[in-house]
Amino acid sequence: MGRYVIAVGGTGSKVLEAIVYAACADAFSAPGEGPLPALDLLSVDVDASCGNTTRVKRAAEAYEEARAALAASPYDHPCFHTRLSIVRWSMNLSRRAASVSQMAARHALDGLLARTLFTATEASLEYSEGFRGHPDLGVLFFADLLGALEDMRAQGQPDELNAMVDRMRADLDRGETVQIGRAHV
């Protein structure tokens, strides 16, 4: 069974960090089956310098080092059994509009919507710095991005979200159940 968690933003990264610490104690166990063999984690954050995202990556790397060392040990151990795979969705930000204003300038209807929903200050916030407590600013960004995923796949461009979807599809093709959790504000 594939188990996946998609975490959005800095708060989502805090949830991923808690998942890493919970995995240390084998908190993800199925009754009668023991600890989950693996969790596949995807961090989605446009703020490349987000401290929360960096912290969870470091915690997951340290966890995997400890898990691998314990797995190689000939002794039984009561924790660190679940393999954690964490990746950050890069979203090819360099190929995207830098702000709501720039994105709206590309599409007339998006421009009308942006002028209606957002102040000029909000619309000029740079995506590379995150949404600064305004998750609604990401609506146009993510709508544009998700709409381009299949084009990216067709062009052979690597993408972490497409890769996760491919793993989910492979699980389903093998007749396995897929469970997806999400963490966001």
Regions from the PLM with identified roles:
Residues M1-V178:
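Segments that form or flank anion-binding pockets
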